[in-house]
């Protein structure tokens, strides 16, 4: 698992571009660059996170309405890797057939992408992890996939509430103290530095993420 102690470097994003949207694996980019996937429930802030770390306010389309990401979206960063925004899970207002289609897209990507280097799981810091969050974490653990956990919307909590809530999320997820949970805010930039450090470490040494 990632450890932010000791020597570290921070990734500098100098180029970021949207490349394509896909449903099936044959539509994924063919340049064999590594993927870092973003997973989380609908409206957890995946698109906002992309815009924050790339310093591009409109690179990924954001919406206050859950369920707007309906395809697998590929963003190429520094011509070195892709951030891949997957459809959000757990949005009840979407018809069952549409949810099943999203589920198929997510499962296809996660199970059949040899370029998948790691996963960023986003969880709303204001709430306990959902059953869908737990299911996703179990999948990630089963496949021993390198993981970064972001606790989003940290600006919605007072500073004194952030650490207790992160500790509560850690207990609910049953992850070790060696797995950092990064409080993150797209509004204030909190956690951006640590996320860029984590991404840099993951890309340079993915096996070093394995606990």
What are these model-predicted stretches?
Residues 2-93, 209:
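Conserved G1/Walker A P-loop phosphate-binding module
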Residues 75, 152, 195:
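Residue-level signal for inorganic ion chemistry
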Residues 53, 78, 87, 123-126, ...:
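Anionic group-transfer/hydrolysis microenvironments
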Residues 89-99, 155-158:
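Flexible beta-alpha connector loops of hexameric P-loop NTPases
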Residues 107-179:
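Conserved C-terminal guanine-recognition region of P-loop GTPase G domains, centered on the G4
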Residues 98-101, 124-125:
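Glycine- and Gly-Pro-enriched alpha-helical subdomains that act as flexible
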Residues 13-25, 157-211:
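Canonical P-loop GTPase G-domain recognition
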């Amino acid at each position: 698992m990632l450890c932010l102690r000791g020597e570290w470097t921070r990734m500098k994003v100098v180029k970021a571009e949207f490349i394509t949207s896909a449903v099936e694996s044959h539509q994924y980019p063919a340049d064999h660059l590594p993927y870092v996937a973003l997973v989380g429930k609908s409206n957890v802030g995946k698109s906002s996170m992309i815009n924050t770390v790339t310093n591009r306010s409109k690179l990924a389309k954001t919406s206050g309405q859950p369920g707007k990401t309906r395809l697998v979206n590929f963003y190429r960063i520094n011509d070195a890797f892709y951030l891949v925004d997957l459809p959000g899970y757990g949005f009840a207002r979407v018809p069952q057939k549409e949810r099943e289609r999203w589920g198929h897209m997510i499962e296809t990507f996660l199970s059949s992408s040899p370029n998948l280097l790691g996963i960023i799981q986003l969880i709303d810091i204001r709430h306990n992890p959902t059953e869908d969050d737990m299911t996703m974490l179990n999948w990630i653990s089963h496949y021993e996939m390198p993981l970064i956990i972001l606790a989003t919307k940290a600006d919605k909590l007072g500073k004194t509430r952030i650490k207790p809530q992160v500790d509560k999320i850690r207990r609910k997820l049953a992850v070790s103290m060696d797995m950092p949970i990064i409080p993150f805010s797209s509004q204030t930039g909190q956690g951006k530095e640590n996320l860029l450090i984590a991404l840099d470490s993951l890309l340079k040494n993915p096996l070093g993420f394995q606990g």
